[in-house]
Amino acid sequence: MHELERDLEEYFAKRMKAAGILTYKFTSPGQAGVPDRILITDGRVLFVELKAPGKKPRPLQTETVRRMRKRGAYCYCISTREQVDRLLYNLAEAWDYPNEGDYDPI
C-alpha cells in the first residue's frame, strides 16, 4: 500500500507533538513554494516539506528552499516515516540540526 502525503502529515504531526516540538502549518499568502511546516524546539527553527513517497518538490519549491538556505535556514524534504523518526531523533536525542543529505533532495 502506498502512503499518501496526508498520512505522512498526520504521522509527522503526531510524532512532533508527542516530543513537545512546536509544529505550525506554513502558509505565506502571495508567496508560493514555501515549505509545509515550521518546527520550533529548544531555540532552533527548521522548515520541512512533506511529500508522498516518490514525489519530488516542484521547481518553485526547490528555488524557494535554495534562497532560504542561502540565508542560513535549515530546510528538509521528508517522504517516509523513517525520515520523520530520524528527524525527531536528531532534534530530541542528538540535540543537533540534522544533515540535509540524510533526507530527500529539495
Q: Which positions does each model-derived feature cover?
A:
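Catalytic phosphate/metal-binding cores of nucleic-acid and nucleotide-processing enzymes, i.e., regions
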Residues: 1-106
